[in-house]
């Protein structure tokens, strides 16, 4: 039987991706974050930090983008505490949001 070479951080990233997508679609009520799609989640090997890559279906001006970033920073704590309740992990990783620009590079 061939061994599957998956790192634990990859499996946890997939789980966090699924949960964060659910949280954004059902629990986040901030209108600044409407149209956000979670593209992928990456974790550091020590699993202390997670990077959540997002894209938005809305086209933003600089002012709107600033509001989006403010909304994301305000929802970080809520997402982390919700993940802490749902996932059986010793420590819930620090959350960092990054815009996924690869969607626009085509």
Could you describe each region identified by the protein language model?
Residues 1-49, 55-106:
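Charge-rich, low-complexity N-terminal segments
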